[in-house]
Amino acid sequence: MATILQNLPAGQKVGIAFSGGLDTSAALRWMKNKGALPYAYTANLGQPDEPDYDAIPRKAMEYGAEKARLIDCRTQLAHEGIAALQAGAFHVRTAGATYFNTTPLGRAVTGTMLVAAMKEDDVHIWGDGSTFKGNDIERFYRYGLLTNPSLKIYKPWLDQLFIDELGGRAEMSAFMTKEGFGYKMSAEKAYSTDSNMLGATHEAKDLEFLNSGMRIVNPIMGVAFWKDDVVVKAEEVSVRFEEGQPVALNGVEFNDPVELFLEANRIGGRHGLGMCDQIENRIIEAKSRGIYEAPGLALLHIAYERLVSGIHNEDTIEQYRMNGLKLGRLLYQGRWFDPQAIMLRETAQRWVARAVTGTVTLELRRGNDYSILNTESPNLTYAPERLSMEKVEDAPFSPADRIGQLTMRNLDIVDTRDKLGVYAQAGLLSLGGNAALAQLGDDSSRK
């Protein structure tokens, strides 16, 4: 039996990741009519745009599900978000603005926890709403098979019969009305939105065109800080970490990471913090564009990186950043639980995060405009007296020590100048006359 089923397996249990929206509602009812036994599974990821989670399973049962379950994924999502923060697992950046991989983190949690719940119900066929052009189809495929090696994949959107009968939203709405549910198709937005507790992604439709920007987006986790009529007042905020774990905001301690993220989202969201516009490479190497929100993660990230820079040495920070870039790509590709990803994140959590204890105080203003006001930690290696421009007692080194250190540099300076001479003889550089700086030569004619 093939792993990916191209036709509906009639008479068999088919699990569907059910959001309650038009697409999955129509798919569930259609599968029921065609003789399958649909089981609906809904992930509670703390989506900021979902008003009533409990209503979703009830809706699935009305549409013909054999069973409908709501799976609370928020705590696991919070833990994975903190792990990504500790490891700096963010590789999509533009001019200092960071995408915090919030959708890939949500898929890692959803893809494992929903399939585990299906397995409990003896459901070994899974469908979801991801399209063949996106990243999610591969992420869910990997996480599903990692969780249940016997899993088979059925996606209505890859079934030609489903496409022929219900190929668009208008057809789906008409189908649900005909079935007696009177489903009213929601008004079309100029873009699509996917969200969880960690962040929101806005993409597609008008946002596929680069002459449409952030200003057409209605934020769901914060304020439209670019609008002149939106009042944003400066706010002083403190964030405290203990051994790499965020534990307090504005002096209030949180034992529940979910509640901490929700409060961080409220604080950052008041300013529009963490909203950015990115062009990125999808898994299949084609470029896509997204507008992202992540107010809470952005707030925690600023404080965490400030402490990292004050506590760890340059080589450790360099390794942390290099590993974070690689780990971010693995997370984006749906490989968060692969051995190489586990190795990279464990390294950061053990040897970087465990030393990160302290409090950072910031002033948040508008959008990503902020200032760091204070950094406190018992583990700081930053010590102002070491490099003070004033005379200090017990100085760590003297002028004579620096003379000796500079004298030792003569060795590599001589070697470097000799090497530049070699390049000049080869025609790669010009050291003409008493030139103080080497200049690149024209080697276009050399083979």
From Swiss-Prot:
Q: Which UniProt keywords apply?
A: Amino-acid biosynthesis, Arginine biosynthesis, ATP-binding, Cytoplasm, Ligase, Nucleotide-binding
**Pfam family, any one:** Arginosuc_syn_C
Summarize where ATP binds, as residue positions. A17, F18, S19, G20, G21, L22, D23, T24, S25, A43, G129, T131, D136, D194
Q: Which organism is it from?
A: Paracidovorax citrulli (strain AAC00-1) (Acidovorax citrulli)
- Enzyme Commission number: 6.3.4.5
- What EC class is this? ligase
In its UniProt entry, what is this protein called? Argininosuccinate synthase
Q: Which GO terms describe its biological process?
A: argininosuccinate metabolic process; L-arginine biosynthetic process; urea cycle
Q: Which residues, if any, are the signal sequence?
A: none
Q: Which NCBIfam families match?
A: argG, PRK05370.1
Annotated L-aspartate binding sites: T131, N135, D136
